[in-house]
């Protein structure tokens, strides 16, 4: 069965869907039959996005990565923000998407 709504679910919801499809196809089938799969994935997507944004903010604040650094040394700011985003993504993946 093709889940055509998947394009309307954000990237985090799509990642969780792919994980469930591979590791828990029965869960997907039950939610399909109940008609709850799309909303479930949208909720996962929102929770993961909120967590990601919060983590990026917390990590950048705690490490002093701010607009002043961006003005003074843009390359260091980009490098630091990429590192922060990568760490936040790993946390969200392990705690929300692959859980």
Where are these regions (language model features)?
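Extended, charged helical/alpha-beta scaffold domains that provide interaction surfaces
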Residues: 1-99
């Amino acid at each position: 069965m093709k889940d055509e709504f998947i394009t309307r679910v954000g990237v985090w919801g799509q990642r969780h869907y792919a994980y469930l499809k591979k590791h828990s196809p029965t869960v997907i089938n039950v939610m399909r039959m109940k008609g709850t799969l799309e909303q479930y994935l949208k909720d996962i997507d929102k929770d993961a996005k909120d967590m990601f944004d919060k983590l990026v903010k917390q990590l950048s604040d705690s490490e002093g990565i701010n607009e002043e650094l961006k003005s003074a040394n843009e390359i260091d700011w980009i490098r630091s923000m990429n590192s922060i985003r990568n760490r936040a993504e790993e946390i969200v993946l392990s705690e929300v998407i692959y859980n």
